[in-house]
Amino acid sequence: MVDMDRISISLPTNLLAEFDEIIEERGYASRSEAIRDSIRDYLIKHKWIHSLEGHRAGTISIIYDHHSTDVMEKLTTIQHDYEKLIVATIHMHLDHDHCMEVVLVKGDASDIKDLTDKLTSQKGVKQVKLTVMVPGGNIPQ
């Protein structure tokens, strides 16, 4: 049998309710199993992102609560720190509280990963998705 650690987490009520719906829909035996599965998916994604190498082009999509303290200023400052990597940004208002930014990037994969990590860790950021491609002539035929 695998050793298990018991942990406690705090979640917003609506997030837990939505997660519980998915647990029921997918037929998980328990909430713990669903959380373990989610953590496994997160670890796989993390390993994939951190195994990227070489020159890449892509997008970093960010959803954030613009009412959160200084989040827009922090995101802008971080983007200015990576100005050589960022080709363009698109800003969209999703609703009264939330905005989405799509950051077009081109450069070394490790720099793209660093930028993504810094954006992800900001308070008020709800979701970040990195999509990368091999630019130009490096695409396998």
Curated annotation (Swiss-Prot):
Cofactor field: Ni(2+)
Binding of Ni(2+), residues: 80, 91, 93, 99
Keyword Cytoplasm: no
UniProt-listed Pfam families: NikR_C, RHH_1
One term of GO molecular function: DNA-binding transcription factor activity
Family membership: Belongs to the transcriptional regulatory CopG/NikR family.
Task of the protein: Transcriptional regulator.
Protein name: Putative nickel-responsive regulator
Organism from which the protein derives: Methanococcus maripaludis (strain C7 / ATCC BAA-1331)
Lineage: Archaea, Methanobacteriati, Methanobacteriota, Methanomada group, Methanococci
